[in-house]
UniProtKB/Swiss-Prot annotation:
It catalyses: diphthine methyl ester-[translation elongation factor 2] + H2O = diphthine-[translation elongation factor 2] + methanol + H(+). It comes from the Eukaryota. InterPro entries: Diphthine_MTase, WD40/YVTN_repeat-like_dom_sf, WD40_repeat_dom_sf, WD40_rpt. Signal peptide: none annotated. Pathway: Protein modification; peptidyl-diphthamide biosynthesis. This is Diphthine methyltransferase homolog. GO terms for molecular function: diphthine methylesterase activity. The lineage of its organism: Eukaryota, Amoebozoa, Evosea, Eumycetozoa, Dictyostelia. Gene3D superfamilies: YVTN repeat-like/Quinoprotein amine dehydrogenase (2.130.10.10). Its EC number is 3.1.1.97. Pfam families: WD40 (PF00400). Catalyzes the demethylation of diphthine methyl ester to form diphthine, an intermediate diphthamide biosynthesis, a post-translational modification of histidine which occurs in translation elongation factor 2 (efbA).
Amino acid sequence: MTEIIKNTKYLDYTSDSVEFYPFNNNIFVCGTYEIEKGDTEYKERRKGKLYLFEIEEEQQQKENDNNNENNNNNKLFKEIQNINFNSGILDMKWNNNKDRILGVVMSKGELNIYQYDEVEKKLELKSSTEISLSNDILSLSLDWNKSGDKLICSFSDGNIGLFKVTKDYSKVTEEKRWKAHDYEAWICAFNYHDESIVFSGGDDCKFKIWDLNQLLNHNDDDIGIPPTPKFTKRCDMGVTSIHCHPTIENLIAVGSYDECLRIWDLKSLKQPIITTDSLGGGIWRIKWHPFQKNKLVTACMGGGFHILSTDPENINDFSTLQIEQSYNGPHKSIAYGVDWSFNKNNFDKQFIGCCSFYDKCLSIWIP
């Protein structure tokens, strides 16, 4: 199967995050950051930019091509907004409820909440929260619960933070912070089918499952007694990515620097359903397909991007998961960000957004 490169853009800063808007197949955001040379303050060295893009409809594209003799493929998606920051963007997630909300976590500890205006086609800031962090600590990842009223964030000191969001998204309050990992907590994620359960992965090579009810009842005055996870699995290398299946309960995908993808059944945690062969690089992002339940896509650092799927004759058997299609396209650097567009009605017009780091490359792949 031959991939189609819909479009390629080279951005101002190094790119690390791509997220499609859940309610329009053609709208997506890309997060970037830059380390400024010569600055001695670790956190102050980063600056960032958030881009909002729109993929042009086919008729609009044909009109543009006819009106421009020197057209090039950069016209196939266009920048409609950018926002500059004095801090690097390290992760973003859309809230999947109908409020059109995007959460953005940045290196210095800012947690920004934006609302997408579908008429004006722009992001509007609803709230900006300064997370209390020491100067050498970075915010690394975030995730929303399914209800859209809580967020979790992970940090480079191994901590995880739980945050409550008001109904109008004007205020974010930290409810709990706990020591989850001995080193960087690279990733955190909610269980979308049980909002009292969250997952985390860290550079201490551990995948952990936490019960929020237990955590909220944990006495922080018990100095030296950390909260206890429901489950801990030690991996060969650092755990870098986790994504809960959006429609199948108890199914979790976990990626690691060891280059292998593991699928876990939460009802049977003795061993994973499958541990894949090497995907060619550390698995930095995993995204389940929003509608085709037997597929996911990965960004594998030095190994490019891969779609994995189960046997088409037995799509529910995740032990058959294997690479269906791979993509490098124009990308010459570390594959960090990836996401599916939300086209429920026509999978032939399904887009995958991909970004890579040092080459500052963003592309749209049609599998």
